[in-house]
Amino acid sequence: MLFRSVMSVKYSEDHAWVKVQDEDLVTIGITDFAQEQLGDLVYIELPKVGHECSRGDNISVIESVKSASDLVAPVSGEIVEVNDRLEDDPELVSEDLMDEVWFIKVKLSNPSELDELMNEETYQTFIGD
């Protein structure tokens, strides 16, 4: 088994960040890049706690004044917590993406999927920054 540092952050091609909390628990949100592309958010629909998601599933709807988008699951597992504050105040996403404003927490069913995500440097290259 490969060692993954607790609290490391990975990124998906769909512009989700994945913060590793421990060996089988991650917190997921959207990147600054995604939020900037969407603009002012007006609505977020979160999945239900207990929902099983597979990598690549659309798990959340994000609507902005510009467009609607889906949060695509970057990993597979059971959703164990959702950030209900986002449904009441979607504009929170633009304030502080990584520390306070997360979408869901997932108990991983396949931790090796984390190895397929990008590190910070690779993600910055991916978005052309």
Q: Predicted segment positions?
A:
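Short, small-residue-biased leader/transition segments that mark boundaries at the very start
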Residues: 1-2
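Acidic/glycine-rich phosphate/pyrophosphate-binding loops and surrounding catalytic core
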Residues: 84, 92-129
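Short beta-strand-turn/beta-hairpin segments enriched in glycine/proline and small hydrophobics
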Residues: 20-40, 64, 69-71
